[in-house]
């Protein structure tokens, strides 16, 4: 399991001074990792410092296996000193054992907007990358590449599909391939409270 080490509920008022800019600059300098051989018993959490001091945060990590290189591509969103910790981009690093990681490189960026929440999948030799773009309004993008590390090209047909659903604040795209070969896309809709009340099921 890879996770972001944010501790927001404890640090928002104190460590981060109620500031998302402060979180983006100093929140989660490492990725948290747990390991298991059986999905029941897990190791204690350890922190992997993949980025250097130029990284302001390492958020929303995900991983995909690269069959060609026979290693794993870990990708995440970060702010960085190269643009004064402004718009975030998607970075990646390679590893074979989740202990040693290659130097991070850019996987995808859009210099005018935040790009976060990457989810990467392989289908029929092509690679598909979902990201959240911080445009106004914010939106989910789908991109395609022949290589796992890009370059990636935006799929405009997906934009038109997204226009058919209710406008709102969506993020954290996750896709699952169904038994019939179709893909099912899940989105976190954070525009309204997540609970619903009912007198019956």
Where are these regions (language model features)?
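Carbohydrate-active catalytic/glycan-binding domains of CAZyme proteins
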Residues: 1-201
């Amino acid at each position: 399991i890879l996770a972001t080490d944010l501790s927001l509920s404890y640090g928002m008022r104190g460590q981060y001074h109620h500031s998302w800019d402060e979180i983006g600059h100093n929140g989660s300098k490492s990725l948290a990792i747990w390991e298991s051989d059986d999905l029941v018993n897990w190791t204690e959490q350890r922190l992997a410092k993949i980025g250097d001091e130029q990284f302001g945060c390492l958020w929303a990590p995900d991983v995909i296996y690269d069959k060609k290189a026979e290693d794993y591509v870990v990708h995440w969103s970060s702010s960085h000193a190269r643009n004064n910790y402004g718009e975030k981009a998607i970075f990646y690093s390679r590893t074979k054992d989740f202990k040693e990681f290659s130097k991070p490189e850019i996987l995808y960026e859009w210099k005018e907007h935040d790009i976060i929440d990457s989810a990467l999948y392989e289908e029929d030799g092509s690679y598909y990358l979902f990201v959240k773009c911080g445009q106004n309004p914010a939106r989910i993008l789908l991109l395609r590449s022949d290589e796992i590390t890009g370059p990636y090209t935006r799929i405009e047909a997906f934009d038109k599909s997204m226009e058919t659903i209710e406008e709102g604040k969506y993020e954290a795209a996750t896709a699952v391939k169904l038994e019939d070969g179709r893909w099912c896309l899940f989105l976190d809709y954070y525009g309204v409270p997540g609970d619903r009340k009912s007198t019956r099921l």
